[in-house]
Amino acid sequence: MSTLPATDTTLLSSELKLVHRLDQRFFALLDAIAQTGSINRAASTAGYSYKGAWMLLESAGNLVNGALIETVTGGKGGGGTRLTPAAVELLAVWRELQRRNLEFLHRQETWLNQLPALAGLLRRMSMKTSARNQFAGVISAIDTGPVTTQVTVTIAGAQEIVATMTTTAANRLKLRIGSNAIALIKSSAVVLVTDFAGFSLSARNQFEGTVSRVERGAVSSLVVLTLPGGACMTASLTNDAIDALSLAVGQTATAVFKAYAVMVAVQQD
């Protein structure tokens, strides 16, 4: 079984913690999936619950603009789960980054410890947020008005998410067309529609997809919608709403949310 390099307890974990929660533990999960062919066993190995592993894989897939795992059916072992080529490449890059940075930190440990400003910068490079939906993309359009500004972020599958913010906020973020950005939407802001009944909605953001997972809770549930480009949109609904819509895996539904519900994050210079 392959093993991942050990992580440094200070700067290395911060420097190599990629966007969202793509850290040593996450890549240990990918490595375990590659070794076991099972999300359940891999989650246990990496210290995740089964549900937590699924949610992290879906969220991370949005940030890297592609699915990280795929299901294999049939065969001698009866099928299972394996990493997609994108995930295999990501895991290989992570290992190489770890190797190079471990070497660097071991050579320069004393020097780095004398530069607290640099250490702080490395730690700030990893953003943490409670928003369930996080989509990495590129700013493709900016419509600036005297009071509000509309920003379009193009994500996987050429899907466009429109965000509305104050022009003051847009200026503060120094938004530019072609810049990388992350669109964040809380799951509670997403409405699922299964039948428009001939009506049109005013909400700017409407994404049709397929229900890929329903996680029922005591009162409310999470519904994951897979979009044509492979991104996953999560909506938080009451159990009564799920029953009323008769939501089930494989069903087509449309995720709807207002432009005002979208937050945009960009890396500052």
Swiss-Prot record:
It comes from the Bacteria. Gene3D superfamilies: 2.40.50.100, Winged helix-like DNA-binding domain superfamily/Winged helix DNA-binding domain. GO terms for biological process: molybdate ion transport; regulation of DNA-templated transcription. PROSITE patterns: MOP (PS51866). Residues 128-194, 200-266 form the Mop domain. GO terms for molecular function: molybdenum ion binding. It holds the Pfam family TOBE. InterPro entries: Mo/tungstate-bd_C_term_dom, ModE, Molybdate_resp_trans_reg, Mop_domain, Transp-assoc_OB_typ1, WH-like_DNA-bd_sf, WH_DNA-bd_sf. Involved in the transport of molybdenum into the cell. May have a role in the early intracellular capture or metabolism of molybdenum. This is Molybdenum transport protein ModE. It comes from Herbaspirillum seropedicae. The lineage of its organism: Bacteria, Pseudomonadati, Pseudomonadota, Betaproteobacteria, Burkholderiales.
